[in-house]
Amino acid sequence: MLSSIYNDKCKHLIIVSYQLPVSLKKVNNKYEITWKNSRSSIANFREIDSNINKIWIGTLEEDIPIEDRDEVESLLKTYNCIPVFIEKRLKYKFYYNFCKGLLWPVLHYSIPLTNDVNYSKNWEKYWGSYYVVNSLFVKKICIFLEDKDTL
């Protein structure tokens, strides 16, 4: 059983994904959290043996105002979720421009063909957003990563 392997050698199983497996909404000035439906591929990790201590690190679909972030982070900790807050504009450049616009086609064998010499130059500005977002994830991981954790 997976838990026997991890309990002997691992303190926590830290699951890092772009998005956390939860949804968040504000009702009557209070945030409510629900697990995303099980059709989400990342949500399937919730099914890993309950004896394994899991910590989730990732972003939320929802944009959280700066003044609400401490409250949201506290609520998410009750779900073993650690948010990486990314500003909306940076998130867009990272996800839609670099990941979906460049990485996804390259990794799925649909490399765009073009004679436009400026095409590759445009990616340089999106590389910066990719680098910054990954740095935010690394900083958050380093805060919570402990000896004997599995990442």
Question: Can you say where each PLM-predicted feature lies in the sequence?
Answer:
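Conserved nucleotide-sugar donor-binding subdomain of glycosyltransferases
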Residues: 90-151
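N-terminal low-complexity, Ser/Thr- and acidic-residue-enriched intrinsically disordered segments
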Residues: 1-91
